[in-house]
C-alpha cells in the first residue's frame, strides 16, 4: 500500500509539471503579444481554459489520493480487527416472557369488567414469634434441646457410676478391716492361752488352776463386739454421706434440666 501511495504521488507531480510549463508559456506569450488586442483576447481565453483544466486535474488527483488513503486505513483496520461471525438473532426468554405478558394483558383487556372480583387483602401480615435460645448454641431447635438433656443425663449417670465404684471400694475396705479385726482377737487369744499355759506349768504347785481359755475368750469376745460396733458406725456414716451426695447431685441434675427447658 505504501508503494502504491508513492506511485500516485509521483504520477500527480508528473501530471502537474506540464501544466506549470504551459502556464509559463502562456505568460510569456501574453507578454509578447500584449500589444495585439485580438491575440490578447484569444490568449486570455486559452489561459482561462488551461487554468480550469489544471484545477480539475488537481482536484481529481487529490480525490484519488484521499480515496487511496481511506482504502489503506480501512484495510489496516480490517486486518487488525478479527471478523465476527454473524449469528442468527435468537429471542431470549425475557423477551418471550414479555410477549406472553403483553398477550395476557390484551386478553384481560378484552374481557368484561363486570366479571372481575375485587378481593380485600389483609393489611397486617401474620408474624411468627421468635424464640431465642441460650447463648451456648441453637437452643431454638427441639433436637438441640433433646441432645442437651441427653448429655446432662449421661453425665449424671457417669457420676452415679463413679460414686458407686467409690462406695464399693469403701465397703470392701471396711469388710477387710472387719475381717482383720475378727482374726486379730483369735491370734491374740491363742497367744494369751499359750502364755497362760506356760505360766500355769511353772506355778502349778503354788497357785490354783484357773480356766485361762474362758477368760481369754471373754476378752476376745468383748474386743470383737467393740470392733463390730465401730465398723457398723463407720458404715452408717459412709452410707449417710453417700446418700447426701446422691441427693445433692440429683437436685443439681434436675436444676440443670429445668434450666435447659426454660431457655429452650
UniProtKB/Swiss-Prot annotation:
Protein purpose: Major non-collagenous bone protein that binds tightly to hydroxyapatite. Appears to form an integral part of the mineralized matrix. Probably important to cell-matrix interaction. Acts as a cytokine involved in enhancing production of interferon-gamma and interleukin-12 and reducing production of interleukin-10 and is essential in the pathway that leads to type I immunity.
UniProt keyword Glycoprotein present: yes
Segments for region (Disordered): 21-141, 166-264
Annotated disulfide bonds: none
Example of a GO cellular component annotation carried by this entry: extracellular space
Record's compositionally biased regions (Basic and acidic residues): 31-51, 186-212, 252-264
Bias kind Polar residues: ranges: 52-73, 233-246
Gene Ontology molecular-function annotations: cytokine activity; extracellular matrix binding; heparin binding
Composition bias, Acidic residues: 97-118
Name of the protein: Osteopontin
Gene this protein is translated from: SPP1
PANTHER family: OSTEOPONTIN (PTHR10607:SF1)
Gene Ontology process terms (BP): biomineral tissue development; cell adhesion; osteoblast differentiation; positive regulation of bone resorption
Residues of this chain annotated as glycosylated in UniProt: 106, 109, 204, 242
Protein localization: Secreted
Motif (Cell attachment site): 132-134
Amino acid at each position: 500500500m505504501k508503494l502504491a501511495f508513492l506511485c500516485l504521488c509521483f504520477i500527480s507531480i508528473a501530471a502537474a509539471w506540464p501544466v506549470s510549463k504551459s502556464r509559463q508559456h502562456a505568460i510569456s506569450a501574453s507578454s509578447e503579444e500584449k500589444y495585439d488586442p485580438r491575440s490578447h483576447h484569444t490568449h486570455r481565453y486559452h489561459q482561462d481554459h488551461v487554468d480550469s483544466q489544471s484545477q480539475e486535474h488537481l482536484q481529481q488527483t487529490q480525490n484519488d489520493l484521499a480515496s487511496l488513503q481511506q482504502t489503506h486505513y480501512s484495510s489496516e483496520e480490517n486486518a487488525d480487527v478479527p471478523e465476527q461471525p454473524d449469528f442468527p438473532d435468537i429471542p431470549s426468554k425475557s423477551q418471550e416472557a414479555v410477549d406472553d405478558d403483553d398477550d395476557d394483558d390484551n386478553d384481560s383487556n378484552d374481557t368484561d369488567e363486570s366479571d372481575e372480583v375485587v378481593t380485600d387483602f389483609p393489611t397486617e401480615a401474620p408474624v411468627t414469634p421468635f424464640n431465642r435460645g441460650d447463648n451456648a448454641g441453637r437452643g431454638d431447635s427441639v433436637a438441640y434441646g433433646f441432645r442437651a438433656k441427653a448429655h446432662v443425663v449421661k453425665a449424671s449417670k457417669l457420676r452415679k457410676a463413679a460414686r458407686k465404684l467409690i462406695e464399693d471400694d469403701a465397703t470392701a475396705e471396711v469388710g477387710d478391716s472387719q475381717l482383720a479385726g475378727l482374726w486379730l482377737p483369735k491370734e491374740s487369744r491363742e497367744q494369751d492361752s499359750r502364755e497362760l499355759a506356760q505360766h500355769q506349768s511353772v506355778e502349778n504347785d503354788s497357785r490354783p488352776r484357773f480356766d485361762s481359755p474362758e477368760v481369754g475368750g471373754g476378752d476376745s469376745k468383748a474386743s470383737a463386739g467393740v470392733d463390730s460396733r465401730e465398723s457398723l458406725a463407720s458404715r452408717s456414716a459412709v452410707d449417710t454421706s453417700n446418700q447426701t451426695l446422691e441427693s445433692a447431685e440429683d437436685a443439681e441434675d434436675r436444676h440443670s434440666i429445668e434450666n435447659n427447658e426454660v431457655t429452650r
